[in-house]
Swiss-Prot record:
Catalytic activity, as annotated: Deacetylation of xylans and xylo-oligosaccharides
Superkingdom of the organism of origin: Eukaryota
BP terms from Gene Ontology: cellulose catabolic process; xylan catabolic process
Protein name (database record): Probable acetylxylan esterase A
A single MF term (Gene Ontology): acetylxylan esterase activity
The species this protein was found in: Aspergillus clavatus (strain ATCC 1007 / CBS 513.65 / DSM 816 / NCTC 3887 / NRRL 1 / QM 1276 / 107)
This protein's record includes keyword Magnesium: no
Active-site annotation: S151
EC nos: 3.1.1.72
Amino acid sequence: MAPFSFLLTLLLYTLSAGASVLESRSSALLPRAGSLQQVTNFGDNPTNVGMYIYVPNNLASNPGIIVAIHYCTGTAEAYYNGSPYAKLAEKHGFIVIYPESPYQGKCWDVSSRASLTHNGGGNSNSIANMVKWTIKKYKTNTSKVFVTGSSSGAMMTNVMAATYPDMFAAGVVYSGVAAGCFMSNTNQQAAWNSTCAHGKSIATPEAWAHVAKAMYPGYDGPRPRMQIYHGSADTTLYPQNYQETCKEWAGVFGYDYNAPRSVENNKPQANYKTTTWGKELQGIYATGVGHTVPINGDRDMAWFGFAK
């Protein structure tokens, strides 16, 4: 029996060692924690969008995800450095995905049919695949996936909420336009739309809701709660876009846009006005603030449910 016992011990050791090697190799494939890392193999990437990720040293078990989307002329690294999300990730344990636009001016494609359609093969599709990769690799909490962005990234935030409403629990929009407002009649990618930018694309809540819902035909499930920021002195994306964005989501959620539940002046700070239509929609209008409204990380954490 001794030879058999020896062989059994050797076999168990070999299997154990092999498992350790496989585990080590698997871990090595994951981005290093505590710094911004590029991911190049996240899956189908129809528009060659760059993926960068920040995994905190203090990663929670079953962590949440925030997708943080940069502005025109920006990069993933610039938004990583200029926004508070990586620092907040260390405090709350979530993962941050920083997509990077593939276009020369670094604006996002919020204009083509592909990007304005669920699984349509545009920028929105690439970003959604980044989220799916992260969920699979890190076993994240699928009920705690959020999206936010500034300027062009705010536009894409609205688009992501409309094209993938089943993916996100909430979104925060810093100085954007309504989803579909930049739609290109010639189906151009990342097209600029001066009519929309200047606040001249005006519609009813019902019409805007139709635009948003058409981005995922047939979908009738839950949609992300939306918080909309805009400044009264914005000369890039004119202030009327605040009204149109709020009208869009009020229409989507079935709120009466003209009868909000509450209007609070000087909240969350002086010269800001917070309008709440219901638990799914809140707008914050900043008097005297230009483009873009500064990110309020603590309020974002409260809206996303990471903090009270």
